[in-house]
Amino acid sequence: MNTYKTYSERGQQHPNACARSLFELMERNESNLSVAVDVTTKKELLSIADAVGPFVCVLKTHIDIVEDFDHDLVAQLEQLAKKHDFLIFEDRKFADIGNTVKHQYANGIYKIASWSHITNAHTVPGEGIIKGLGEVGLPLGRGLLLLAEMSSKGALTKGSYTSESVEMARRNKDFVFGFIAQHKMNEHDDEDFVVMSPGVGLDVKGDGLGQQYRTPHEVIVESGGDIIIVGRGIYGNPDQVEAQAKRYRQAGWDAYLERVRLHKK
């Protein structure tokens, strides 16, 4: 199964351009860490991005919560992505009909498609959402993740919702390269979906607001996830940002090496 191959092997054979770039970058930087930078000022976002940049493969943003957003922020984020060799993932969670999301992705004040390598979408509206986003993203070499499962307590993303989301991804492998999910989604030898898993923590099990945390070992070795998404565990203490990024990067990479070892033929 492709889940258990090395990132390098998976990158060489992946049908999606964005996924190929991502796997190559992960192997090159020895990182499967994504930091979710959920802060509300341009200064904080750029400061954290620069501090964690050397240790991540993906920087995850919520650009619409930044109160002083401007296009200089985007330009500086793009510069940091080049400087530190990471991809940008705007966690937009599109959830409307195809024609609407097409404009939300390409236009408006954020113009997400112009700078974000990866974005994501709910599958609630049906397959049209993938087609609409793909019209914009495919020509730009972008990649889409579908929300198959969420890490919050009581989430409705389970059962038939999850299985239908996987079927939609299978029909759109040119643009959809993976999922936001809690475990591996690959069932067939001819598919290789990248799984990014939120809700990762080394020190706590929850946040009192419904978030449930798992360790990198649980996510990658036990559940078959590929990339760990960490937020407050890294930048919650401003004096510890770099140290925590190093710590999570090492924990994630060690878990990946263990998984490869366990499944070597």
Curated annotation (Swiss-Prot):
Say if the entry is tagged with keyword Lyase.
yes
Known pathway: Pyrimidine metabolism; UMP biosynthesis via de novo pathway; UMP from orotate: step 2/2
Matching SUPFAM superfamilies: Ribulose-phoshate binding barrel
Biological process terms in GO annotation = 'de novo' pyrimidine nucleobase biosynthetic process; 'de novo' UMP biosynthetic process
Catalysed reaction(s) here are: orotidine 5'-phosphate + H(+) = UMP + CO2
UniProt keyword tRNA-binding present: no
Q: Which residues form a coiled coil?
A: none
The catalytic activity of this protein is classed by the Enzyme Commission as 4.1.1.23
Give the annotated active site.
93
NCBIfam families reported in the protein's UniProt record: pyrF
Q: Identify its protein family.
A: Belongs to the OMP decarboxylase family.
The name this protein goes by in its record: Orotidine 5'-phosphate decarboxylase
* Organism per entry: Mucor circinelloides f. lusitanicus (Mucor racemosus var. lusitanicus)
- Lineage, broadest ranks: Eukaryota, Fungi, Fungi incertae sedis, Mucoromycota, Mucoromycotina
